Amino acid sequence: MQRVMPASWSSGGSLLPFRVSTTTKVVLFSLTAGVALMSVLSRFLRRRKPPRPPRRARKYTGRRNRNSMRSPNDLISIAGSKASARSGSPVGSTLAYSDRLSMASGSIGVGVLGVQNAGPGSSVVTQLTAQQLGMMGMEALDTVINFWEDALAAHYSPGGLPALLTTAEDSEFCREIQNLLEMAYTLQEQSELLFLDQRSVLFREEHSIDEAEEEAGEADDDRRSRKSGSVLSRAGSDPNFDSAESFASALDQVADLREFDGFIETSYEEYPLFQSALKHHDEYTVPCRTIRAELMHCSTDTEYLAKLHCVRLAFQFLFKDPAVGQWICDAGRQILTDLLCLGDKDTKEFLVGYEDMVNYLHDSNNWPCIQMELEQRNVKAMTFYDICLDFIILDSFKDLDAPPASVTAVVQNRWLSNGFKETALTTAVWSVLKAKKRMLKFPNGFMSHFYVISEQISPLMAWGFFGPNENLRDICHYFREELLAFLGDIFSFQKSRFTTIEEFSQDVLQHMQTRVNNIGVKFSQ
């Protein structure tokens, strides 16, 4: 052992200031040699370690939540939370971008077009399919829409407070942003049909391969059945026939019956009044301000126009009886008065304005002016349906479905009291109506009287639909549902008799009385 160790170690004093025994020297030498050997082995093994296989990308199995499903009414309330949730750090943006890439580069659609295998230490480059690239574009479009929504919200409330008074330029700017968002939402829906819908060409190419395999399997089964002399069912020959994939592919092969609606001939022999309306439409074309075939549950626009002609004739027939006209006038006054009372509003100014409107309509000398004024607003016929139901009520409901963003910004602001919200909302509605009233061509015409009534009803309806009062909201929604149900009844073959004007008019009046009674019962609860 002394031959192995250096001479200086044997002397025991040249390296250490104290004497070391031989056993201690052997232990120290062994430890040093072991550590050196382990370091050499670890470096060698690390160099020979094979590269780790790339991690498989996550497969995208579900449809993403579309941002365009939100209604335009939620832009102001949601945009703030989006802005706070979105981080500007490089790490956050990198992670978000990698998530989108992993989702888009998964095994979707018809598969990859080509793969380039590189050597160890270099990345694997995968050529993306058309569907994957399209989905990445959809994600980018969703990000763009988020920023545009935040821009709209920031313009309305630059300092966190609602901007109640805006100039004409600001309103025009916000309107253009909303139009831009609407076009972006439409583009989002179209891209979903191209890249996510099961009926897309991208999915049909995949299904064509499955169909070819199924046809080959069917041919083999037929040959087996002819040899054995037994009749085998489709399910018996294919053990995977009831699987989820086969069921999904079978659903894609089922024809959409709605595509053949235009080729189905419906017999209208039992509806003589409707038949005459169809002939009238073929000869003269029924004029219409807005086609509401979907709202009235009509299968085609032609059916809606023919039924619209019947409805106009029915109301003209009903108003020949002064008693019917007086009943409709009294019913409208009672319903609107009850609404104001349920909202704790004073009804005096409303009743004065309502009586002025009734007296104005009863004067036959005013009707040429009324017709001229309404024709400028594209009202095609001077009937109760066209003026009251279509032009006033249905358009008002449409405005309530898409209120101005300034209104939603005030109502949905959690830092404002309910009293201040209601006052601000009423002031905003009054200012808009007064501005419209000043621009009227006929200062004392029909629209002027209508705006007087709207100054009392519109703030209440807006507060009822968007305010925090649950009872008032329930009443307003019930009022709208009953009116829409009444319109659906008079346009229905099952609820109304399109046989003669007399019978159809009787059904229309009966439906109106039923809905008025329902509203009265609801308001009295």
UniProtKB/Swiss-Prot annotation:
Residues 47-67 have a biased composition (Basic residues). It comes from the Eukaryota. The chain crosses the membrane at residues 26-45. Disulfide bonds: none annotated. GO terms for biological process: mitochondrial fusion; mitochondrion organization; positive regulation of macroautophagy; positive regulation of mitophagy. Residues 211-220 have a biased composition (Acidic residues). Pfam families: Miga. InterPro entries: Miga. Keywords: Membrane, Mitochondrion, Mitochondrion outer membrane, Transmembrane, Transmembrane helix. Residues 47-73, 210-239 are annotated as: Disordered. Its main location: mitochondrion. One of its GO terms (molecular function) is phosphatidylinositol 3-kinase activator activity. It is found in: Mitochondrion outer membrane. One of its GO terms (cellular component) is mitochondrion. It is a single-pass membrane protein. Regulator of mitochondrial fusion required to maintain neuronal homeostasis. PANTHER family: MITOGUARDIN. Interacts with zuc. Belongs to the mitoguardin family. This is Mitoguardin. It comes from Drosophila melanogaster.
